[in-house]
């Protein structure tokens, strides 16, 4: 490269105007990625009823990864917001897709999706989103994001649900009851009555057997480790998250850490429980604490197994 005044890097160029951008001052999720001062970030709804000012101090700042994709909701708002009727939810697997032939670029779906997971393609004039790798799903393969994840953090599985209960669950008056209401929508694949009805409705036995072996059912229903992202949106999201364990936040007196028996107290974790509850259970701390305690107990047990050779 010839000598110049700048480092040989690719400077940002606007896809809208085509001009070079000297300084990027705002972008998607700008506040969430620490792109601005804390005064703006603290407006995040997840900080409701959290002593937010404490986390504005650098030494108390916490980070967590939240890999988000389309939630493929049971009650998708994007479907209802599209004037062209281009968005639909497939009956056979629940995947939400955009018909590119029907899409007219109204962009109502972008503002209609509370998870911000629909994007407008300025070149094609169409809206686009995660398609859950449906061609791979149809051929029995996992999604690309699941297969290529080095940490193996993603789990896929069949989950049976009662479609007749969706409206009732989404209409639950108290936001904190929405998580439990969605659990009631899911069906036990080992229940003989569920199996009988599923076969009558044309569900193949192979799908029922897959549901019985589904890791998703175990994480969400049996162990109750996975929780829905912002259930207060009432979309009944179908991509759930296991809350993250975080380093222990030292108590006021240096060297003292809250303990609950043999495992650390979940209230001593660096990421506030209330913050996670606002994100995953509409502010209800009980399911979050239960999941964190189970994760801490399993970590403690596994540590003793591998290090102390106990059990």
Where are these regions (language model features)?
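Non-ligating segments of multi-cofactor redox enzymes
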Residues: 1-311
């Amino acid at each position: 490269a010839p000598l110049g005044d700048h480092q040989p890097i690719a400077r940002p160029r606007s896809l809208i105007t085509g001009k070079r951008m000297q300084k990027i001052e705002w972008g998607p999720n700008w506040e969430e990625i620490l792109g601005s001062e804390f005064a703006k970030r603290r407006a995040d709804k997840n900080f409701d009823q959290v002593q937010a000012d404490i986390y504005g101090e650098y030494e108390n700042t916490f980070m967590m990864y939240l890999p988000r994709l389309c939630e493929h909701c049971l009650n998708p708002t994007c479907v209802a917001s599209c004037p062209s009727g281009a968005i639909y939810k497939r009956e056979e697997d629940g995947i939400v897709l955009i018909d590119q032939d029907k899409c007219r670029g109204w962009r109502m779906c972008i503002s209609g999706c509370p998870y911000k997971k629909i994007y407008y393609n300025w070149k094609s004039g169409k809206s686009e989103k995660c398609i859950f790798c449906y061609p791979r799903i149809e051929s029995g393969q996992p999604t690309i994001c699941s297969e290529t994840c080095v940490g193996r953090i993603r789990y896929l599985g069949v989950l049976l649900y009662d479609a007749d209960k969706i409206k009732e669950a989404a209409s639950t008056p108290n936001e904190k009851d929405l998580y439990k209401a969605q659990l009631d929508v899911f069906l036990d694949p080992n229940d003989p009555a569920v199996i009988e009805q599923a076969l009558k409705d044309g569900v193949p036995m192979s799908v029922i057997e897959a549901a019985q072996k589904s890791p998703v059912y175990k994480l969400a229903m049996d162990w109750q480790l996975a929780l829905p992202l912002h259930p207060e949106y009432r979309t009944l999201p179908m991509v759930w998250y296991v809350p993250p364990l975080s380093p222990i936040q030292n108590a006021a007196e240096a060297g003292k850490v809250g303990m609950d028996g043999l495992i650390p107290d979940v209230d001593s974790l660096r990421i506030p429980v209330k913050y996670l509850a606002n994100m995953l259970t509409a502010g209800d701390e009980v399911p979050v604490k239960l999941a964190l305690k189970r994760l801490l107990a399993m970590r403690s047990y596994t540590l003793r197994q591998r290090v102390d050779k106990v059990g």
